[in-house]
Amino acid sequence: YNLIEQIAVIADGKKFVSALIVPNFEMLSQALKDLNIKYKNTADLIKHSQVIEYIGKQLQKFQKDLPDYEQIKKFTLLPSAFTIERNEITPSLKLRRKVIYANYSREIEAMYK
């Protein structure tokens, strides 16, 4: 899915599925050209309501064939990728979920409030 660079899906022990999403900022800025959104940096861009809405609609299209209980209900956009340096991914680019959950615990908790 070319709008998403990285995604960490959160579901274990939760009432619904959520996700931390790192957009593919190059593809996103191409897709949003028509919306004429002004932003300084990626942190600024991901807070924009039109960006969140756009990614949400794309996510819905992508998940349409999944059973309801498997669909991502809420998501948080992140301004930068998960990295090996922060120990969030392995050298083979697998997600280290425990580290990601710890590093983004505030963002995760906010999705379940």
Question: Where do the protein language model's features map onto the residues?
Answer:
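AMP-binding adenylation
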Residues: Y1-K113
